[in-house]
Amino acid sequence: MPLRALVAVIVTTAVMLVPRAWAQTAWERYKARFMMPDARIIDTANGNVSHTEGQGFAMLLAVANNDRPAFDKLWQWTDSTLRDKSNGLFYWRYNPVAPDPIADKNNATDGDTLIAWALLRAQKQWQDKRYATASDAITASLLKYTVVTFAGRQVMLPGVKGFNRNDHLNLNPSYFIFPAWRAFAERTHLTAWRTLQSDGQALLGQMGWGKSHLPSDWVALRADGKMLPAKEWPPRMSFDAIRIPLYISWVDPHSALLAPWKAWMQSYPRLQTPAWINVSTNEVAPWNMAGGLLAVRDLTLGEPLERRRLTTRMIITPPASSCWSGWRNRISASAVMALQVSQPVCLRAERKEQERLTM
């Protein structure tokens, strides 16, 4: 199963408690730049393709900014265009100029999870039970089609197809969206969601290689419970895995799971922290963290909000070389939104939108 080329757009802001006026201004700029009239969120450096992750992040932002008209348009386009009626989940990628805009009929569970979480938050924000009903249907499909027990652990596969290799599973630990899983557990009272949280955290505690003791973007879980970087991808902690401390921090900013991340990040001056590290060879990226990556670093280390504000900006990074030697524009036009203490904490985290394995 080939790994296709990777391209995307960097969109960054600081992680911080933002004044509502600032947040609304940023949201309007985000919509103007990345939201099409039909509410499709575009990856402007990748032929204006769209992904369920981008739709889900934008839906979360719409809720956080109390923008119900935008939310409804986002949800309507996503539901009507990307829904896989065979399983209730969503086709992960849409290419507007392809003969078949949805050539890959697989899903991506991070996108599905974000969409369901946004719908659940919308119900709380606007007291419309239809949103919660839609969220419940998606989470039920996630449990039915993507959650499996393997090596004594309950895990969520990255997609319905292509990740169960019989003697091992290929997992993406950045798809372990703990704050969403916690919300689903509180909503449904199903033990499966709490087991996913506890088993996911237990697995993360055992993922770590090289001098950094950090996980790679993609991890192979063997039937005997042992784990190693998945052979189909470069063994790097990079633009996928950087979201792991983000999701951990949203659930528990004092979690022991953050210890290796803090140790590695603190081993470099702030502006000289490498953008990625090869956890097998200890090779680091020839460029440093900026924008959203720095925002995740600052959040993980508990840096003062004043420092985070200094990184608040929009950045477009030009392509460097081939994807295998490292492109600097592997970042999606997506945005991550969390709400803590009933106030918006906003990060447009720079990351790559990895073209996924297909059968």
Curated annotation (Swiss-Prot):
- EC assignment: the record states 3.2.1.4
Q: Which domain of life is it from?
A: Bacteria
Q: Name one GO biological process term.
A: cellulose catabolic process
> What GO molecular function annotations does the UniProt record carry, in alphabetical order?
cellulase activity
Active site location: E53, D110
Which EC class is this protein assigned? hydrolase
Substrates-to-products reaction catalysed: Endohydrolysis of (1->4)-beta-D-glucosidic linkages in cellulose, lichenin and cereal beta-D-glucans
Signal peptide positions on this chain: 1-23
Query: Which keywords accompany this UniProt record?
Result: Carbohydrate metabolism, Cellulose degradation, Glycosidase, Hydrolase, Polysaccharide degradation, Signal
Output the Pfam families linked to this UniProt entry.
Answer: Glyco_hydro_8
Listed InterPro entries: 6-hairpin_glycosidase_sf (IPR008928), 6hp_glycosidase-like_sf (IPR012341), Glyco_hydro_8 (IPR002037), Glyco_hydro_8_CS (IPR019834)
Give the protein family: Belongs to the glycosyl hydrolase 8 (cellulase D) family.
Function, as annotated, reads: The biological conversion of cellulose to glucose generally requires three types of hydrolytic enzymes: (1) Endoglucanases which cut internal beta-1,4-glucosidic bonds; (2) Exocellobiohydrolases that cut the disaccharide cellobiose from the non-reducing end of the cellulose polymer chain; (3) Beta-1,4-glucosidases which hydrolyze the cellobiose and other short cello-oligosaccharides to glucose.
Q: What is this protein called?
A: Endoglucanase
Organism expressing this protein natively: Cellulomonas uda
Lineage at the top is: Bacteria, Bacillati, Actinomycetota, Actinomycetes, Micrococcales
